[in-house]
Amino acid sequence: MLQTEMKVIQQTEIADKVYELILTGECVADMSPGQFLMLKPSRSDLLMRRPISICSYDKTAKTCILLYRIEGDGTRDFSKLSEGDTIDVLGPLGKGFDIDQTPAPKTALLIGGGIGVPPMYQLGKELAGKGVQVTFVNGFQSAKDSFYEKEMNAYGTVHIATVDGSLGTQGFVTDITNNFPEEPDVIYSCGPKAMLQAVKASFPETKTYLSLEERMACGIGACYACVCPKADDAKKQFKVCEDGPVFRADEVSL
């Protein structure tokens, strides 16, 4: 973990209120799929950092890409960043995805919902690099909210579900995955809690890893703002920022 400043290379709105932010900095060397950064807004009245998942990184170029959606004052502040600006960053943080499994999987299903889609990109890229057959299933409210279909196509097959039917299959991600003829060797998923619950219920016998989306304050396990009950004892809790955000599906109670 490192508190540092990163420089903005580029920022682009790639979907409705969704921005692609390209940063450069030394902390890229320590990044792994599924981790996140805590970004500090520039406004003095916004005291709390905001957690943003890492979409991708290039350790040789020392660059990373963050995708985020404007949800409030903090992310609106980030959307005003432009080339050459700097931003105060804490990270990379959290426990990411386990991609070095034994035995190695031959097929992997990556399921993302909304702003839970971004971490699936680097994960899919690295799995494909290991020879794993990757299938992406991305869920959005509407076509105007969708992003990164072309980029993900470089590393696997991409399926899209939209609630209003304006792109891909009308419905939810499980309306696609429940019709697959065979189950994958491993599943990775990130998105809203209701989606993760549905994924967990649909594949009870498949090795599944879930990246939880929780509101965070500190990002380092000190404040207990982002806890999740343990599956084997609801009185005990995981700290999502420190113990996660990635957990085995059988570890957590959603």
UniProtKB/Swiss-Prot annotation:
A GO molecular-function descriptor: metal ion binding
Binding site for [2Fe-2S] cluster: C218, C223, C226, C241
Subunit structure: Heterotetramer of 2 PyrK and 2 PyrD type B subunits.
Pfam family, one: DHODB_Fe-S_bind
CDD domains, alphabetized: DHOD_e_trans (cd06218)
Associated pathway: Pyrimidine metabolism; UMP biosynthesis via de novo pathway; orotate from (S)-dihydroorotate (NAD(+) route): step 1/1
Function according to Swiss-Prot or TrEMBL: Responsible for channeling the electrons from the oxidation of dihydroorotate from the FMN redox center in the PyrD type B subunit to the ultimate electron acceptor NAD(+).
Keywords: 2Fe-2S, Electron transport, FAD, Flavoprotein, Iron, Iron-sulfur, Metal-binding, Pyrimidine biosynthesis, Transport
Comment on bound cofactor: Binds 1 [2Fe-2S] cluster per subunit. Binds 1 FAD per subunit.
Full protein name: Dihydroorotate dehydrogenase B (NAD(+)), electron transfer subunit
Family from the record: Belongs to the PyrK family.
PANTHER family: DIHYDROOROTATE DEHYDROGENASE B (NAD(+)), ELECTRON TRANSFER SUBUNIT, DIHYDROOROTATE DEHYDROGENASE B (NAD(+)), ELECTRON TRANSFER SUBUNIT-RELATED
GO BP term, example: 'de novo' UMP biosynthetic process
InterPro entries, alphabetized: Cyt_c3_hydrogenase_gsu, Dihydroorotate_DH_ele_sf, Dihydroorotate_DH_Fe-S-bd, Dihydroorotate_DHASE_ETsu, FAD-bd_FR_type, FNR_nucleotide-bd, OxRdtase_FAD/NAD-bd, PyrK_electron_transfer
Binding site for FAD: R50, P51, I52, S53, L67, Y68, R69, G74, T75
Cofactors named for this entry: [2Fe-2S] cluster; FAD
Domain FAD-binding FR-type: residue ranges: 1-99
